[in-house]
């Protein structure tokens, strides 16, 4: 079971060619699932049609938009209420980060992705924001304040996602919701780069650890590739 951004690919980038070939062969001999906050079109852009089809199931939008071989099997429709939306607008307008590239609110099935720098940012603007956020912890601050102000009242939760985003869903509609489909699996191995508290892999990682499964909190896709290669060598 794999996250995409920062786990199989560089953030918002495409899968490495050599890793892609290795991962396709891995998919042929294992039950492989993807669970990502990104929508279907972005996931296909990142991993490619062949990998997308080779997975037994892809859980897009944190499990709120689900596909098997490009056929949609489930979609959760949801819209963020006005008050928390206005809070995010206010944080955007008063952010100390000067570069606002546009497309700051990305509504996806069952979730909203919010970004201060914006999804239209250039690669350099993304790097600049990563440095800014690493120092100022802006996304962590927004997410924590958001959850305190709106979490219980609106039954919603916010988590830090990817390098520049914040994912907002209804409570119980994060990535951990997909585990209801895996009750018959005796062994699950999960790979994710945002397994820390406040990250959008945290809830599913903690649920799996609590059930006796294995979680690899990876640093990047190179780390994932290394671990999978070592697992393959051990099994042969």
Predicted regions and their residues:
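A generic structural motif
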Residues: 28-31, 153-157, 186, 210-214
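Conserved acidic, metal-coordinating active-site core of Asp-based
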Residues: 99-189
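Short, solvent-exposed loop/turn segments at secondary-structure junctions
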Residues: 39-40, 65, 118-121, 164-165, ...
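Substrate-recognition element of Asp-dependent hydrolases with the DxDx(T/V) motif
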Residues: 24-46, 58, 103-116, 158-162, ...
């Amino acid at each position: 079971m794999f996250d995409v951004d920062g786990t199989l690919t560089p953030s918002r980038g495409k899968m490495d060619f050599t890793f892609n070939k290795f991962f396709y062969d891995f998919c042929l001999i294992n039950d492989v699932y993807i669970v990502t906050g990104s929508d279907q079109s972005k996931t296909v852009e990142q991993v490619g049609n062949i990998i997308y089809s080779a997975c037994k199931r892809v859980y897009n939008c944190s499990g709120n938009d689900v596909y098997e071989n490009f056929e949609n099997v489930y979609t959760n429709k949801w819209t963020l209420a006005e008050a928390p939306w206005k809070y995010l607008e206010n944080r955007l307008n008063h952010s100390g980060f000067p570069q606002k590239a546009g497309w700051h609110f990305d509504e996806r099935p069952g979730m909203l992705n919010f970004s201060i720098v914006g999804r239209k940012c250039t690669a350099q603007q993304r790097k600049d924001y990563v440095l800014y956020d690493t120092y100022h912890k802006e996304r962590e601050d927004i997410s924590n304040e958001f959850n305190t102000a709106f979490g219980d009242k609106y039954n919603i939760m916010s988590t830090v996602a990817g390098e520049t985003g914040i994912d907002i869903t209804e409570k119980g509609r994060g990535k951990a919701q997909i585990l209801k489909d895996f009750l018959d699996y005796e062994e699950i191995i999960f790979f994710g780069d945002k397994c820390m508290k406040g990250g959008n892999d945290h809830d599913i990682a903690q649920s799996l650890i609590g059930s006796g499964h294995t979680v690899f909190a990876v640093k990047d896709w190179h780390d994932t590739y290394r671990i999978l290669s070592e697992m393959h060598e051990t099994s042969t």
